Amino acid sequence: MSAILSVDDLNDFISPGVACIKPIETLPTAAPPAGDANSSLEVEVILDGQQPEAKSNAPPAEISLTDCLACSGCVTSAEAVLVSLQSHNEVLNMLDSAPALKLVGPDANGKHSVQGLENSDAKLYVASVSPQSRASLAAACGNGVTEQQAGRMIEQLFLGEQGLARGGKWGNKFTWVVDTNTAREATLVLGSDEVLGGLIAPSDKAATPVLTASCPGWVCYAEKTHPYVLPHLSRVKSPQALMGTLLKTSLSRILDIAPERIWHLAVMPCFDKKLEASREELTDAVWAGDGKPGRGVRDVDCVITSKEVLMLAASRGFDFFSLSASMPPQTPRFPDQLIHDFLFRPGHRQQSREAGTSGGNMHFILRHLQAKNPGSQIQTVPGRNADVVEYKLIAEAGEVMFKAARYYGFRNIQNLVRKLKPAKTSRMPGGKPFGSAKRPAGKASGLDYGYVEVMACPGGCTNGGGQIKVDDQVVVDRKGLAVKPGPQEQKEWQKEVDEAYFSGDESGSRAQDESLDLVVDGISPSHIRNVLTHWSTLTGIQLERLAYTSYREVVSDVGKEKKMTDTERVVQLAGKIGGGW
């Protein structure tokens, strides 16, 4: 390696671009009537360094959060832009806006009703929490607090009288807090069926190799920078998105209320999840409309990170770590028995270390295929660094049945997309192709994988940008650190977070799964398919609209030649002729 460029000089941060792909356009005012003394052409001349006089009647500039998806900034710096748009303050403002809707029932006929609908601002509050966020908060608690115990503290925050209800204008609290692990299990089965051709698969299947699409940072990067990989992205929604769709569709149809009356908060390890929640593909315009993306009601109304959970408690005037880790208050039953059993299963299933810290999409596919082929073995081949690993499923006879890989971090992702880039064909008759087309088919590493698990963060989702870091003041104070933590301390801290993530009770697996045909890592694919089919029947919506999503190339006009106005032409011409004003 060159002495000028070392590994220490490299990182995954890309500075935001200075140009906006959606510049503010000022519409021309109506032309003055003929004969007006002021109707002659006037050109405003501005000296260098001066700003034009603001027009008092100019319309306010508006840039929607969806427009941010098309910005020229990078995906890893998106959190700096979006943190003020979806934050803990938005949660508090919403809770204090009006009395919450209350679920009543069931009555003698098994029907539920909702009280408070006469107030148009009233909402039914539901929160979903990721296991990575629970692990981060558990590590911050210290003293051997497990992920499950941290989860109970979060439930006390959202459901208990000593949580957010304390000090609020209306004393509002959430009706339910659900675990995104349940939605993750559904996405694992859906993803396996998509890759292996199972019973449930999207009509528009992804091209091989199928690439994970549950990481919004990676998806945003692909849409803006490498659109040629979009056909490879898995069509299965992320656990956050699937949970949002499940809650909004089920509750709105069962309770006969509009989707906007249900307010869904997600607690995630990543700031880029705020980007995901703003996607037009994840609104009721898709599942309740014509199936096409549009500006409808979001399936996830707000996303906050693990760090912001602490800020949420502090804004109400108490310390999150003072909350009890005991069982939370009893909540109403979900108004559908099968979905209730799916969302609120007893126990807490332990995460598999082999599956990693990002949900285990690839590992589940391998284990599912292995379960169908007795005697086969999974072989692991380490890559160039810890965030690149290749996996092979070897049949009992010795042949390779399936290959998959794990690529974490943008440095490794860039190597992956380079291998997937289509070859440039020569324009000369009989010319040789360029790039990857020179290599024989099947020889290029990365192209013969059946599945690739791609995550933007090195180390996976437990190392997300919204996680609590070792140099955060709360960790420094609770650990009593005398000096500022460095990279080595962060590595040790990450190990603590990972240990909390893998903590759990093995007895938490569903006992009823054992009686079914096939169980993979404690998950019954047939049981998940039954739940998904029931969900589709209950809502009257095709599963294609509920469980799958789409992607689109984001085209930027940065660097493209733009049309000049008459004023700009006059100024440019004067500069050329007279040497400038």
Swiss-Prot record:
Which residues of the sequence carry a binding annotation for [4Fe-4S] cluster 2?
C215, C270, C457, C461
* Gene Ontology terms, MF aspect: 4 iron, 4 sulfur cluster binding; iron-sulfur cluster binding; metal ion binding
Please give the Pfam families that the UniProt record associates with this protein.
Fe_hyd_lg_C (PF02906)
Report whether Nucleotide-binding shows up as a keyword of the record.
no
Q: Which UniProt keywords apply?
A: 4Fe-4S, Iron, Iron-sulfur, Metal-binding
Q: Which GO terms describe its cellular component?
A: cytosolic [4Fe-4S] assembly targeting complex
Q: Which InterPro entries match?
A: Cytosolic_Fe-S_CAF, Fe_hydrogenase, Fe_hydrogenase_lsu_C
Note the SUPFAM superfamilies from the entry.
Fe-only hydrogenase (SSF53920)
- Do the record's keywords include DNA damage? no
Q: Where does [4Fe-4S] cluster 1 bind?
A: C20, C68, C71, C74
| Single biological process term from Gene Ontology | iron-sulfur cluster assembly
The UniProt family comment states: Belongs to the NARF family.
Return the PANTHER family for the record: NITRATE, FORMATE, IRON DEHYDROGENASE (PTHR11615)
Q: What does this protein do?
A: Component of the cytosolic Fe/S protein assembly machinery. Required for maturation of extramitochondrial Fe/S proteins. May play a role in the transfer of pre-assembled Fe/S clusters to target apoproteins.
Protein's name in the database: Cytosolic Fe-S cluster assembly factor nar-1
- Species name: Neurospora crassa (strain ATCC 24698 / 74-OR23-1A / CBS 708.71 / DSM 1257 / FGSC 987)
Identify the gene encoding this protein: nar-1
